[in-house]
Amino acid sequence: MSILGTVIVGIVILLGVIGAVVQVWPSAPLVGGAILVWAWMTGTTSAWIIFAVAALVLILGTVLKYVIPARGMNKAGIPQSTLVWGAAGGVVGWFIGLPLGLVLGMVAAIFIVEYLRSRDTATAWASTLQALKAFGWTIAIELIAALTSATAWGIGV
């Protein structure tokens, strides 16, 4: 692969890693797709092995980013719909106030949904904090998977 091609792949991987943090665009498809293009264009056995490792890490990360937070929320008695409403509030907040709006919209939506469910401010706030922890786990798991895959690619380059 040419130097320009490698740089473009690296930029797409970087965008994927950033996507793991900002949660606005999908991280795993960007990182995995970029490494797939690199492996295809490079064509070596080691490139395909690196792609396979990266793909497995990204698939595992995608599964775990749903399973681990869901278990924590289930243990706390918070329905999955709360996280869905939080994500919707985050999207609305993003369009109102960009990154800060994303966080504020998510927190507000989770609190409102949980308050309407429990009719208790303390319970709603505790549920909001638990949902935020779950969201944090989602980001951390996706970021670890993206960085691990990016590192595997970096070793291969």
PLM features: residue spans?
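Helix-coil boundary and interhelical linker segments in multi-pass alpha-helical membrane proteins
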Residues: 1-5, 39-51, 155-157
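Selective recognition of hydrophobic, aromatic-rich stretches within alpha-helical transmembrane segments
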Residues: 24, 28-30, 54, 98-113
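Transmembrane alpha-helix interface/packing and boundary motifs in multi-pass membrane proteins
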Residues: 13-30, 90-99
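Alpha-helical transmembrane segments of multi-pass membrane proteins
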Residues: 12, 16, 38, 57-66, ...
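Interfacial segments of multi-pass membrane proteins
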Residues: 30-46, 89-94, 108-117
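Short, non-helical or kinked segments that cap or interrupt transmembrane helices
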Residues: 21-31, 75-84
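Helix-adjacent hinge/juxtasegments
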Residues: 49, 53-93
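C-terminal binding/interaction regions
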Residues: 95, 106, 116-157
